[in-house]
């Protein structure tokens, strides 16, 4: 595998993860800002991409974005192809939808709102690039199946091509792209010892709302039979 431009080698990553990065969540990969963008770094819009991490507390990408003091689009994308996979179900979507509604409530308390879009991730990012000239994409590394793995690689490729800075943070004990397991224990221990982050008190909203954003409470997906006795979503 050839690394994308600007990515750190696996070994260096492993060493950094073992020794700690001085941050709450261990940074997996980052594409640094492009030199020609440095003069434009005022008022740059950052996308915080929510996947299955539907919370505001202990959320390193959200905290990092809030500390920049610049506009943030808190984004969740309803990907219909994902919800047609054999290991997804209506009960999972119902839980996710309730969690999205609660996440929107939490973000409103920080002066922002959740932006829910529908479609494939690359198309949504292209739309946001045109409408809000997004310059950063922050997100948690997801441990899922082949579909989400391929989707994440496509996002990294798009960011590289469009010269959009991206950053991944780890949130679990799973460490991708290690050549061996020699440093896994150090990486896991370093992550588990990090303090829990509080929810950001203020999250600057974009200057204009995203056109076409959906009300999470009204979104439906065709993911199979319902389960009335499932666990409710949200943090309350």
Give names to the regions the model predicted.
Residues 4-5, 10, 17, 21:
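Hydrophobic, low-acid, alpha-helix-prone terminal segments
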Residues 33-43:
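Short, Lys/Arg-enriched N-terminal segments with co-localized hydrophobic residues
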Residues 40, 162-164, 183-236:
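Glycine/tryptophan-enriched, flexible segments
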Residues 43-112:
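N-terminal beta-strand-loop-alpha-helix module at the start
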Residues 115-131, 161:
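Structural beta-alpha unit
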Residues 135-148:
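Acidic beta-strand-to-loop metal/phosphate-binding motif
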Residues 148-167:
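Short acidic, glycine/proline-enriched helix-loop-strand junctions
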